[in-house]
Amino acid sequence: MFMKATETMICLVDGEHYLPVTRAAVETLDSMEHIDVKALIFIGGTEKLRTSSPEEYTEIMGRPVHFGDDPHRIPYKLIGELIRKYGADTVMDLSDEPVLDYSKRFRIASVVLGEGAVYRGPDFEFQPLTEYDILEKPSLKILGTGKRIGKTAVSAYAARLIHERQYNPCVVAMGRGGPEEPEIVHGDRIEITPEFLMEQSDKGVHAASDHWEDALMSRILTVGCRRCGGGMVGDVFITNMKRGAETANRLDADFVILEGSGAAIPPVKSNRHIVLVGANQPLINIKNFFGPFRIGLADLVIVTMCEEPMAGDEKVREIVDFIESINPEAEVITTVFRPKPLGEIEGKNVLFATTAPDSVKDLLVEYLESEYSCRVVGTTPHLSNRPLLQRDIERYIEDADVMLTELKAAAVDVATKDALEAGLEVIYCDNIPVVRDGAQDELDDAIISVVERAIADFNLRKTP
C-alpha cells in the first residue's frame, strides 16, 4: 500500500481572521496523516487580533507562532529563516486581502521557492524548480528574466572568455528548436561556414539554434537540447536537458556552462548563477511576479540594453537599485550590445540582419560604419519574422555585396539561403556586451570570479 511521506508545513496567518477560525483551519491541516504543521508565522492585520504577544498566541494556537519586527510589514526574511529552521517542505498561506495582495504573494513565493519549498494556498500552488543533481564537473548557469535580452550573446562571450582563461568549458544549451537527441557540435574542431550551416539546415537541423551560435561565436564544444513550454517560475514542460548534461559529463571538458532559454531555466543543478536582466523590459516584469526570484539566484547580474531608446539613465538606476535591494550579495554590471562581424567587411556594401529592435537601427548602423569602414545599404530587424525578413531582403539585396547577419531564428534558412543564391558573401555577426560605466575588465573579472567560486564549491562538495 502506498503511503505519503510526511509533509512538514509552516502556515502564514493574519489578524484579519478570528483566532478560532484560524485555529480550526490549522487543525484541519494537522489532522491529515501526511501533514505536520510545525509553526505559524503572523504576517499582519490587526482587526480581529486580541493579542500581539507571541507567547499568548502560541498558547492559543497550540504551536509556535512567530512575529516579524513590524506587524505592518510582511516578514519576508523571517519566512525564509523559519523554512530553514523547521526544514519545511511547504508554506501554506491562510491569509487573505487586505494583508496580502497579488504582488506580495509573488514576493512570498519568490522567498519560499528560493528556499526549495512549496508555496500553497486555497487555489494555487507554486513548486520549486526542478534541478537534477547529475553534473560531475563544476558548472554555472546563465539564465534571464525574459526573451530577447541577449542571453546567448552573453553566454557566447562568457564561454569564449572562460576558454581563453584555460578552464576548458563546454556549453549545454536548450532552445525551442533544439534536437530530439542532445547534439554535440565540435566548434573547437570544425569550420562553421555559411555553406556548412546550409547543409545542416537542408538535413532538417535548426542550424540557428543557440548551441550552433555558441559554437560559431566561441569556437568551443557545445551540446544542443530542446525544450517546450515555459512556466512562471522557470520550469519547462519537456526537455532533454538532463540527457544533455549527462552527455557533458562524458565529454573532454572541465567546466560546464548551462544556458537557459527565454525565461526558462535549465533543470540541472549548478554551482553558481549568472542572471541577465534586460533594461528594455517593462519594470513590472522585473520587480514583480518571478523577476525577484530569478534575481535572487544570481551571483552576478548583467543588466543589458542600458541605453536610449530602450532605457534611459533613470530607469537603469531604478533597475540596479532594485536588484541590489533584492540580492545585495550579487555583483551588478550594466552593459550595452555592439555588433562584431566575424569576417572582413571594410569597404563593402552591407545588408545587416538582426533581432535588435528597429528603434536602435540608426545607432547600430553608425557603429558598424564608423568602426568597420563599411557602407550599410539596408537593415532588417526581422530575423524572427520570416515573411517580413524575406520582404526586406528582396528590397535591399541588389545593392549589397555582403549579408551580415546574427545567427538567430531565420538566419540560415532564409537570410543565408537567399544571400548565397544571390551570389552574396555571408558573414555572421556576434553581439558583444560592452560595459556601460567602467572598464571592460570589470565584466571579465566578474565572470571569472563566478567561475572560480563554482570550482571551489564543486571541490568542497567532493571533499569527504
UniProtKB/Swiss-Prot annotation:
Paired cysteines (S-S): none
Reported pH dependence: Optimum pH is 6.0.
Temperature dependence (free text): Optimum temperature is 65 degrees Celsius.
Main location: cytoplasm
Enzyme superclass (EC): ligase
Domain of life of the source: Archaea
Induction: Constitutively expressed.
Keywords: ATP-binding, Cytoplasm, Ligase, Nucleotide-binding
Activation and inhibition: Activity decreases in response to phosphate limitation.
Reactions catalysed: (2R)-2,3-bisphosphoglycerate + ATP + H(+) = cyclic (2R)-2,3-bisphosphoglycerate + ADP + phosphate
Matches recorded under InterPro entries: Cyc_diphosphoglycerate_synth
GO molecular function ontology, one term from the record: cyclic 2,3-diphosphoglycerate synthetase activity
Gene Ontology cellular component annotations, sorted alphabetically: cytoplasm
Similarity field: Belongs to the cyclic 2,3-diphosphoglycerate synthetase family.
Protein name: Cyclic 2,3-diphosphoglycerate synthetase
